[in-house]
Amino acid sequence: KSLIYKNKNTSLDKNKYINDFKKFNLELNHFTKIIIYKTIEENGIKLSVLSTELACFFKNYIDDDEYVDSLVEVLGELADNSLSHGESDCLIDINIETVYNRKNPSPNKYISLDIVIVNFDKKLLGDRIKDKFFNNDFKGSPKTEKLLNTALENHKSKFSESYTFDDFCNCASFQWRVSSRQSSSDSFAGTGLTTLIDGLINKSESVYCYVYSGNKIINFINGMVSLDENRFIGFNKENDFLNKIPDKSSITRSNYNLNGVLYNLNFIVKK
């Protein structure tokens, strides 16, 4: 059984979870790395080391350098979110397998990228965005603040048990140049997560991706993750975050509560 399943319906014990992962055997198609926040903080180890390791690993399987660069940027951004935003440890686990299309056999080989990123944070995915709303703390980001306030004004009349303010903040964390860092400016925030949507999901043959935090899940569904003129993602068929709430298939619930944030990213791509 998976480590997530074994810890269902309870708080994850970070040390036990990490120790369990240390028991796993690494193979050529399997990459596992645990990044300890305290080590980064004390020794100043840079995430460029992680980026180099990931690039070397992916290039053994994927010929498309641009796609590899996008993967590395996304995973580096998500790891950085865990370390600098949440001040918490981060676990990255990647498995690569060759797959075939039974309905349409072809000489082209495809691979399945199964990526799990977990950070062990007391704060959930959208909590820091929510804090920014409550504290009016979008300093240096007037355009972003205006767009998000417009979206909130249009969404709040549609809030319900299945789509709450917390869900709105979760979705907001993926928008272009939106950051959960304190006092971030428009210039540098949120670019990696937008690349996740624009550069990976829409360029893959098949996709199954979601982010899971608390008991809330955002599903990244083809056709609902395109960027609008503001480079925002609607999570709906209209591709309109400012005026329309996400599609009901994009926002779902789990029966179990996860303390932290888990990204499950599955891509089918040409080898």
Residue ranges and their predicted role:
Residues 42, 59-70, 161, 184-188, ...:
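Conserved aromatic-histidine-acidic binding/catalytic patches
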Residues 56, 60, 84, 179:
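Conserved helix-loop functional segments at active or binding sites
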Residues 46, 63-74, 165, 169, ...:
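Short amphipathic alpha-helical segments
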Residues 126-271:
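Flexible, glycine-/charge-rich segments associated with ATP-binding catalytic modules
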Residues 1-64, 156, 266-271:
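C-terminal effector/catalytic modules and regulatory tails appended to multi-domain proteins
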Residues 65-103, 193-202:
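Conserved ATP-binding N-box helix of the HATPase_c
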Residues 76-77, 113-119, 210-212, 263-264:
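Extended hydrophobic secondary-structure segments that form protein cores and membrane-embedded regions
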Residues 82-135, 153-154, 246-252:
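ATP-lid-like helix-loop hinge signature
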